[in-house]
């Protein structure tokens, strides 16, 4: 019997909506990253994007444990000398709560073109309203 390999054109992708309210950031991000990769499916193939679409709502209500809300720092660099910027978790969650979840999930995906394709299937929104109702996403409990 030959080993099964999923073909990109035959992969069936579902849409799921995840409510981030009260969820721990890391535990939420690991489950989302696993679903984006397709590791929950029996036809998972490492070199093929077999994952589903994930819509995350209530991103501003995600929580972190311990003193991370004040101690966790996000760094970015412009590429120019002295161009490093930093922002704390508290300030980032107030300014752009979507970026907190996006950054956590992106760090858990492969760092290659396939990982970038997987990342594009993640949709994160600030409130409880999202524009993907036409796709009829199923609720995913994490």
Curated annotation (Swiss-Prot):
Entry keyword Transmembrane: no
Source species, domain of life: Bacteria
Cross-referenced SUPFAM superfamilies, in alphabetical order?
Answer: Ribosomal protein L13
Q: Which InterPro entries match?
A: Ribosomal_uL13, Ribosomal_uL13_bac-type, Ribosomal_uL13_CS, Ribosomal_uL13_sf
Task: State the Gene3D superfamilies in the record.
Answer: Ribosomal protein L13
A GO biological-process term? negative regulation of translation
Per the record, a Pfam family?
Ribosomal_L13
Any single GO molecular-function term of the entry would be: mRNA binding
Q: Which GO terms describe its cellular component?
A: cytosolic large ribosomal subunit
What keywords are assigned to this protein?
Answer: Ribonucleoprotein, Ribosomal protein
Functional summary from the UniProt entry: This protein is one of the early assembly proteins of the 50S ribosomal subunit, although it is not seen to bind rRNA by itself. It is important during the early stages of 50S assembly.
NCBIfam families from the entry? rplM_bact (TIGR01066)
Family membership: Belongs to the universal ribosomal protein uL13 family.
Note the subunit structure.
Part of the 50S ribosomal subunit.
Its recorded name reads Large ribosomal subunit protein uL13
Q: What is the lineage of its organism?
A: Bacteria, Pseudomonadati, Pseudomonadota, Gammaproteobacteria, Pseudomonadales
Gene coding for it? rplM
